[in-house]
Amino acid sequence: MSSKYPRSVRRCLPLCALTLEAALILLFYFFTHYDASLEDQKGLVASYQVGQDLTVMAALGLGFLTSNFRRHSWSSVAFNLFMLALGVQWAILLDGFLSQFPPGKVVITLFSIRLATMSAMSVLISAGAVLGKVNLAQLVVMVLVEVTALGTLRMVISNIFNTDYHMNLRHFYVFAAYFGLTVAWCLPKPLPKGTEDNDQRATIPSLSAMLGALFLWMFWPSVNSALLRSPIQRKNAMFNTYYALAVSVVTAISGSSLAHPQRKISMTYVHSAVLAGGVAVGTSCHLIPSPWLAMVLGLVAGLISIGGAKCLPVCCNRVLGIHHISVMHSIFSLLGLLGEITYIVLLVLHTVWNGNGMIGFQVLLSIGELSLAIVIALTSGLLTGLLLNLKIWKAPHVAKYFDDQVFWKFPHLAVGF
């Protein structure tokens, strides 16, 4: 059986990808160099371990989390790794160019790699809404546009609102979710009759998705604390994230059983809701003064995630035609907004406790940053969706959505692989 992947794309994609990689190599040759400062060995090892945690989360966690479609698990894992590798390279260059004026040599440090990895992770989150409906060439365009849009957002927030690295990246959950949902909304929506089977989850891919959720669950404190400079803030961020995640697990399993008429547990609900606490405390994890607050936030986040996973597909998939919206929307966008609201409330309380009279100004700044992030996400997502609809990319036909056979060579073709 011959591949249904358009022949023109199969022929030009390797050449285009290698040409893009060669261009990146030249940019690294002319515009980058390693940090020559002497850093103590203990600090170097600790910094590398945080970067390693982020890479595990991105490559294994987010890669396997999106592999729950029965006939699209290979592409989900491999395409995520491809996007991560490309996104990190482009993010390092872009962050270096945007952070200095006039432009000069980009200094590569372990911290800049951490920052680039988190920027690339936003693409992997967004791609969860479109994987199975686009080819690799379209994903390359999506990586370049989204990393550029997120870098621009960070630069604008940093210059206008004068925030540090952690604060100007705290919106990346919301940004990634709404960017991905906007791109998915622009793509061809209906699945033809007879192809709905490709959109179904199976037991083995669901176990793979749960494995990805476990990787994310174990290493999520590293994401929430990766860009914090103060040791006290890093400690608070890690502790509060662990407490919130622990409560999310209990809430996910209990809530999943409660949501089923026969009190059975749904793997789909569980592998999304166990991560709810980590997303919800991501923005404010360093400000939470007591573990019980993080635990309450994890409980509320778990319930919202279960409710979103149960209710949103019924109304949103039919109205918007966006597949996989349950995980994307109930985890990252809804809980990202919950985290933003929590941050504003804690900021107000912190300002009152310290006797600062600038409460209204601080709230206005926070709302302005969030609004700017959503506007840029929707605008750049719409632009990306329109670009991906161009015929030059030879997008997969809707009859071949969520089908690994379009992209991969199999040693044998068997029904239900």
Curated annotation (Swiss-Prot):
Protein name, per record: Blood group Rh(CE) polypeptide
GO MF annotation terms: ammonium channel activity
Tissue: Restricted to tissues or cell lines expressing erythroid characters. Isoform 4g and isoform RhPI-Alpha are expressed in immature erythroblasts but not in mature erythroblasts.
Gene behind the chain: RHCE
Effect seen on changing residue 60 to I: Found in antigen C/Rh2
The species this protein was found in: Homo sapiens (Human)
Consequence of changing residue 41 to R: Found in antigen C(W)/Rh8
Source superkingdom: Eukaryota
Cited SUPFAM superfamilies: Ammonium transporter (SSF111352)
